[in-house]
Amino acid sequence: MSVNIPSNSVPSGASRFQVHVINEGHGSGAAMSDSTDPPHYEETSFGDEAQNRLKISFRPGNQECYENFLQTGETAKTDTTFHAYDSHTNTYYLQTFGHNTMDAVPKIEYYRNTGSVSGPKVNRPSLQEIHEQLAKNVAVAPGSADRVANGDGMPGDEQAENKEEDVTGVVKFGWVKGVLVRCMLNIWGVMLFIRLSWIVGEAGIGLGVIIIGLSVVVTTLTGISMSAICTNGVVRGGGAYYLISRSLGPEFGGSIGLIFRFANAVRVAMYVVGFAETVVDLLKESDSMMVDPTNDIRIIGSITVVILLGISVAGMEWEAKAQVILLVILLIGIANFFIGTVIPSNNEKKSRGFFNYQASIFAENFGPSFTEGEGFFSVFAIFFPAATGILAGANISGDLEDPQDAIPRGTMLAIFITTVAYIGVAICVRACVVRDATGSMNDTVVSGMNCNGSAACGLGYDFSRCQHEPCQYGLMNNFQVMSMVSGFGPLITAGIFSATLSSALASLVSAPKVFQALCKDNIFKGLQFFAKGYGKNNEPLRGYFLTFVIAMAFILIAELNVIAPIISNFFLASYALINFSCFHASYAKSPGWRPAYGIYNMWVSLFGAILCCAVMFVINWWAAVITYVIELFLYIYVTYKKPDVNWGSSTQALSYVSALDNALELTTVEDHVKNFRPQCIVLTGGPMTRPALLDITHAFTKNSGLCICCEVFVGPRKLCVKEMNSGMAKKQAWLMKNKIKAFYAAVAADCFRDGVRSLLQASGLGRMKPNTLVIGYKKNWRKAPLSELENYVGIIHDAFDFEIGVVIVRISQGFDISPVLQVQDELEKLEQERLALEAAIKDNDCEEGKGGIRGLFKKAGKLNITKPAPKKDSNISTIQSMHVGEFNQKLVEASAQFKKKQGKGTIDVWWLFDDGGLTLLIPYILTLRKKWKDCKLRIYVGGKINRIEEEKISMASLLSKFRIKFADIHIIGDINIKPNKESWKVFEEMIEPYRLHESHKDLTTAEKLKRESPWKITDAELEAVKEKSYRQVRLNELLQEHSRAANLIVLSLPVARKGSISDLLYMAWLEILTKNLPPVLLVRGNHKNVLTFYS
């Protein structure tokens, strides 16, 4: 027995699932035969409030769950409160697949983009929400887990700010009306009725069919590639631009989008001029010319394009109805032509060259007969625009019900039908009409007259004078041949009107649609004006008027044969990129490339792209060059502007594949000293908190080495991981925004040293592993907790253990500007509050201006709001003064000192110990940078007083072999003498608080002190390394003497032997060594060569 629990019996805070309880008996014979089946789930619909509820069917043995449900409305007994993740309103995921879980079943809503017109974007439960431990006995307020969001994790209460588009009343088309009809009307354009006869007259039947076939090959290959791209995901508005931009990226899409939009606008002019030519021919026959043929074409064309603009502005629904009517007229016209070919010709038609089907005419017209100035490719250039209609359906992709299905089906069928029609008309007209005819019924062959052997002569007409003077009729001279051949001429005229007007109308509609999509993406900032749409169909009215202006300009040319070749290259460029997009997406081997249209091949698409490019140059080489120059210019412009879009293009996919292949290939390359590059881990914390440290490192790694900004989150892993993950993208984005070529990496660890160890061991990839650790000098080492000091010195030891070089950077003001950043954040918050306050005041002013009772109430509100405003301003002023005074302005200036161009000066390199050459290589790389190029290298090395000149010559020889330019070399001969008493006293005072002084105490007391304070400096230790301590103090004296005015000092880092030098003594060495100096880099390589003088 099945019991249906009505929905109103379920508590509002529990579950909205419709539950069907099936056979609740325990082991009874009433058990259903499928009792071993898993729980059954299905989606049901119960009106607006209960869409897509989950129906849970209980199986035998679930009596406890059933009783619990009757009592509490829940499907499981639990003390835990679950969050809601239903697609529409609040609910709990319970008994999913028979278990109490928050896991969500697969739904299409989880995979939609934000603002999708097909439904809302829904967020599934996050991994943390189903993985973390649930807090017990915590009530969840209704609506707290509403997940209908904007795709960025925003809660449901902010949903009002991200309303979905209103799609009610929007006109959408199927594949027949939206694609097939449009493509057929565009392909059966002006060329079918008023140029195809001339084309086959020039090229003959053989080459004419080849011209049609070549065009069909280009369009078919493009159609296949377009179908593959269309079926690789949901297609939105934008047509060819959308396909190319989402496949190859904004650089290609933006450049070709403008060109394609312009080509479509010119295409309107081409069809309107074709229509006007036909009307002018009719006016000639009736002797009703207005001015002259050229100006009449301009007048009629201008009036026509105004009418077409009116239809377009009226909306897509009216335009679609007009297209259907025009197609019916066009089909009648084509049928009328074929009927006319079998109706016996009268004398008037014979005099004009029409003799019905004749084998002699077919044979005579089979070969080409190009007139002066014409050839195969010039004729092809005139015909090819007729084939460009294959994008008519794709160009209105945003107005299709199902673009993924409609575009491939409609486009490929339209290509097939129109190709058959073109070839049929070409063959029929060539088999019936001779090339030249006089139109005079008196030009018959008289008995005994010498015949010239032409087909017309054999059929009783002598048109031989057409060889000496121009004639008005025949395939080569009369553009209205199809009207003459047809059974009823006015129907062909109607067909011409239908073909030309429908094609012009389709182009007039599609060009603004494509342009609107391009402008919405904001790739070209100045074109945002044309992105605005009007009405429920989001009609691009501004784009319509722009297209009208362009079309009007080209209509004034009034010459169809001039206009047609102009757009051929633009359309071919678009086709080439569509084919290349399909090839590129396949070649990139991205898992996201999964087109449902399987009839494609990447190499065929590449062939199609090459064929399009070749045809462009063959048709008109200089026009092809101009097209590519324009496209290249636009490509460079978009690349330079770097639009803020991310479409997952195949260019990005190929970048990944290339990087992966190169990284793998690099692993097979053995290390060589000539290929050494500094690959640095920089312990910056958040990159924005220590910009100076990052700047100096970036100066010697940019374009030549690896730079990884690292941060260690210390604390409970659970909390640290959450904080770390939330800031990853933001910090990497900060690096990109500041044009710093570096990566950001972070780890969570229980202590700082463990985190750095992990980074030193695991950072990098293959050969791109860090070989140098860069850290800032710990300025507060005397005040810092002992654990921090141990960690700091410990990571230096760890780096040496891992055979990684170390660079310690010291500047007088320190690196950390976190306090300044905190103040800036506060200022930004206050500024946002101030702007919001001003907006609220402005809104209240507007409401007050409306008058009435409502305005009276708003007036009081305005007074309450305006009072705190001065207080906010005073707060801002106070914090600004804090920013300048309390937070040291010198710290801000010091943080930017390496961003500035360094003036003329020196980089002093104190290469005291040979570490493999890193101490010399880093300053050399710095001098190659634009900001440091005015700084000269001065080299300081230790030596003996009696051998200064010899050692100077020796060092100069070594540096010249290393090909390192230097300004001067100094040999320091007195480096090992004792420092003066004042300097030594400063050092002794520095270490005094940390000394144990065990030698002045008895043995027992001394041992006790050592156990209690093992970190302190013992007298024994200090005596053992006294000479080294002398050296650090003496070096500072020499640095003060020789390098006080240097822009930068690069100095060999002293190494503390483990177990011999305490952490405090080592930090005292570093302190006294770098005290009161310009910026200092303490460098120690891993003692492996990084310089060589061998080629």
Curated annotation (Swiss-Prot):
UniProt GO BP: cell volume homeostasis; chloride ion homeostasis; chloride transmembrane transport; chloride transport; diterpenoid metabolic process; kidney development; monoatomic ion transmembrane transport; potassium ion homeostasis
| Membrane topology (UniProt) | Multi-pass membrane protein
Listed result of changing residue 114 to A: Loss of interaction with PPP3CB
Q: In which tissues is it expressed?
A: Expressed predominantly in kidney (at protein level).
Task: Tell me where the transmembrane regions lie.
Answer: 174-194, 198-218, 256-276, 299-319, 324-344, 376-396, 414-434, 547-567, 568-588, 606-626
Q: Which InterPro entries match?
A: AA-permease/SLC12A_dom, AA_permease_N, SLC12_C, Slc12a1, SLC12A1/SLC12A2, SLC12A_fam
- Locus of motif RFXV motif: 16-19
Q: Which residues lie on this side of the membrane: Extracellular?
A: 195-197, 277-298, 345-375, 435-546, 589-605
Topological domain (Cytoplasmic) residues are 1-173, 219-255, 320-323, 397-413, 627-1095
GO MF term list: protein serine/threonine kinase binding; sodium:potassium:chloride symporter activity
* Keyword annotations of the record: Cell membrane, Chloride, Glycoprotein, Ion transport, Membrane, Phosphoprotein, Potassium, Potassium transport, Sodium, Sodium transport, Symport, Transmembrane, Transmembrane helix, Transport
Q: Explain what the record says happens when changing residue 101 to D.
A: No effect on interaction with PPP3CB
* Annotated spans, Disordered: 26-45
Question: Principal localization?
Answer: membrane
Task: Please give the activity regulation comment for this entry.
Answer: Activated following phosphorylation by OXSR1/OSR1 and STK39/SPAK downstream of WNK kinases (WNK1, WNK2, WNK3 or WNK4).
GO cellular component terms, A-Z: apical plasma membrane; cell surface; extracellular exosome
Q: Which residues are glycosylated?
A: 442, 452
Location in the cell reads:
Apical cell membrane
Q: Which residues carry this modification: Phosphothreonine?
A: 91, 96, 101, 114
| Catalyzed chemical reaction(s) | K(+)(out) + 2 chloride(out) + Na(+)(out) = K(+)(in) + 2 chloride(in) + Na(+)(in)
Residue numbers bearing the Phosphoserine modification: 57, 87, 116, 126, 144
Family matches, as PANTHER family:
SOLUTE CARRIER FAMILY 12 MEMBER 1 (PTHR11827:SF93), SOLUTE CARRIER FAMILY 12, CATION COTRANSPORTERS (PTHR11827)
Q: What does this protein do?
A: Renal sodium, potassium and chloride ion cotransporter that mediates the transepithelial NaCl reabsorption in the thick ascending limb and plays an essential role in the urinary concentration and volume regulation. Electrically silent transporter system.
Q: Which family, according to the similarity comment?
A: Belongs to the SLC12A transporter family.
Q: What is the UniProt domain comment for this protein?
A: The RFXV motif mediates binding with OXSR1/OSR1 and STK39/SPAK.
Report the protein name in the record. Solute carrier family 12 member 1
Instruction: Name its species.
Output: Rattus norvegicus (Rat)
Specify the taxonomic lineage: Eukaryota, Metazoa, Chordata, Craniata, Vertebrata
